[in-house]
């Protein structure tokens, strides 16, 4: 079965002024849509059509070598963006079990944000910054290049930030740190909490 572009759970302008409407439209309707189209083309006629995107990206080594790069890039792009849209909200509230765990691990939410921001700002070129739950149930901040996802390494992402230039350049140009600062105003902590609970069951 072909993968489909998911609908956004809010309007394109809902995250203004932090993430602008035009960026959201291009990011979702053009960039994400392209990943879906290219992923479907790559896996057409293979057993991968019957697997979930999580199964595919978590087991890239089992993908046939002739389509592995296309699946890694476009499958990762589809998975990452499908999660990213859910991790954003115009009604951000800093509460929940995961907030308490973050404070335990990093000392304060602000210290965590600083460490996450360093990882996001320090990602050379295109990529993502993530808060993940590792195999032992511990929280960790990691970054991945391009459209790689931490599940390939056996880690469960519960918060992610797209630091590809297409995610912020229209509004922030080369000022990636300003985009990272703005991100905290639209984080869907309810979703992060839900993902944390599922990952630590």
UniProtKB/Swiss-Prot annotation:
Disulfide bonds: none
Record Pfam families: Sod_Fe_C (PF02777), Sod_Fe_N (PF00081)
Gene Ontology annotations for the cellular component aspect, listed alphabetically: cytoplasm
Protein name: Superoxide dismutase [Mn/Fe]
Keywords: Iron, Manganese, Metal-binding, Oxidoreductase, Stress response
PROSITE patterns named in the record: SOD_MN (PS00088)
One function term, GO molecular function aspect: superoxide dismutase activity
SUPFAM superfamilies documented for this protein: Fe,Mn superoxide dismutase (SOD), C-terminal domain, Fe,Mn superoxide dismutase (SOD), N-terminal domain
Task performed by this protein: Destroys superoxide anion radicals which are normally produced within the cells and which are toxic to biological systems. Catalyzes the dismutation of superoxide anion radicals into O2 and H2O2 by successive reduction and oxidation of the transition metal ion at the active site.
Subunit-level organization: Homodimer.
Cofactor(s) the protein needs: Mn(2+); Fe(3+)
EC number: 1.15.1.1
Positions with a binding annotation for Fe(3+): 27, 81, 162, 166
Cofactor note (record): Binds 1 Mn(2+) or Fe(3+) ion per subunit.
Iron as UniProt keyword: yes
Lineage of producing organism: Bacteria, Bacillati, Bacillota, Bacilli, Bacillales
Membership in a protein family: Belongs to the iron/manganese superoxide dismutase family.
């Amino acid at each position: 079965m072909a993968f489909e572009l998911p609908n956004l759970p809010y309007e394109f302008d809902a995250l203004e002024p932090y993430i602008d409407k035009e960026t959201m439209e291009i990011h979702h309707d053009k960039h994400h849509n392209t990943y879906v189209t290219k992923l479907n083309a790559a896996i057409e006629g293979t057993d991968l059509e019957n697997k979930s995107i999580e199964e595919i990206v978590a087991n890239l080594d089992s993908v046939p070598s002739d389509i592995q790069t296309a699946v890694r890039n476009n499958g990762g792009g589809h998975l990452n963006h499908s999660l990213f849209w859910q991790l954003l909200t115009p009604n951000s509230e800093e509460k929940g079990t995961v907030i308490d765990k973050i404070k335990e691990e990093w000392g304060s939410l602000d210290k965590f944000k600083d460490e996450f921001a360093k990882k996001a700002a320090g990602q050379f070129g295109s990529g993502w910054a993530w808060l993940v739950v590792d195999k032992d149930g511990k929280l960790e901040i990691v970054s991945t290049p391009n459209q790689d996802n931490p599940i390939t390494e056996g880690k469960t992402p519960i918060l992610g930030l797209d630091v590809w230039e297409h995610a912020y350049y229209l509004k922030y140009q080369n000022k990636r740190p300003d985009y990272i600062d703005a991100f905290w105003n639209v984080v869907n902590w309810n979703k992060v909490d839900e993902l944390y609970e599922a990952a630590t069951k």
